Amino acid sequence: MQIKEPLRVGIGGPVGSGKTALTLALCQRLRNVYNIAVVTNDIYTREDAEFLTRNEALAPERIIGVETGGCPHTAIREDASMNLEAVAQLSERFNPLDIVFVESGGDNLAATFSPELSDLTIYVIDVAAGEKIPRKGGPGITKSDLLVINKIDLAPMVGASLEVMEKDARRMRGERPFIFTNLKRGQGLEDIVGFIEKQGLML
């Protein structure tokens, strides 16, 4: 039996930016529409996988937690074999799988997904890290298919200007899209779903 190749969506970003919150929200929004699964990456635990299971993102057998050890961005870039194996397992188990979300371990602004592992990349940063984050650049900011600027509700508390962040994101990314979100309240989620469907599934 031929195994369908799913759309692989890489979700990256610094620790605490909202990667797992985005993965959870996307699973809850899309699980009744598409056949989906998740691969998470943690250095020494399966904490993100357990969080998603606990919050009933998907059935537990649809979530594989990869323990990367050492440097988390190596597992999504230079040596993606563990992640590729997890994607292959899920593709076989739930054939025909539509989408696999691959969430990276907490990484820095220089981390990117291997093209072997991800068809579409979403990079999540958060307003609480300061308005200067978009202009710091790095491949996640400049080269990802979609930049998500999360936790916009915190802007007044940390003295961050969304206007400045928007201007810097536009300057750093050129034509590449970015979306402001408050994932706790679901704000911006539909725009992300629309992007995945249009760019990845060609709907």
From Swiss-Prot:
Facilitates the functional incorporation of the urease nickel metallocenter. This process requires GTP hydrolysis, probably effectuated by UreG. One of its GO terms (biological process) is urea catabolic process. One of its GO terms (cellular component) is cytoplasm. The gene is ureG. Belongs to the SIMIBI class G3E GTPase family. UreG subfamily. This is Urease accessory protein UreG. Keywords: Chaperone, Cytoplasm, GTP-binding, Nickel insertion, Nucleotide-binding. It comes from Methylobacillus flagellatus (strain ATCC 51484 / DSM 6875 / VKM B-1610 / KT). Pfam families: cobW. SUPFAM superfamilies: P-loop containing nucleoside triphosphate hydrolases. Homodimer. UreD, UreF and UreG form a complex that acts as a GTP-hydrolysis-dependent molecular chaperone, activating the urease apoprotein by helping to assemble the nickel containing metallocenter of UreC. The UreE protein probably delivers the nickel. One of its GO terms (molecular function) is nickel cation binding. It is found in: Cytoplasm. GTP binds at G13, P14, V15, G16, S17, G18, K19, T20. The keyword NADP does not apply.
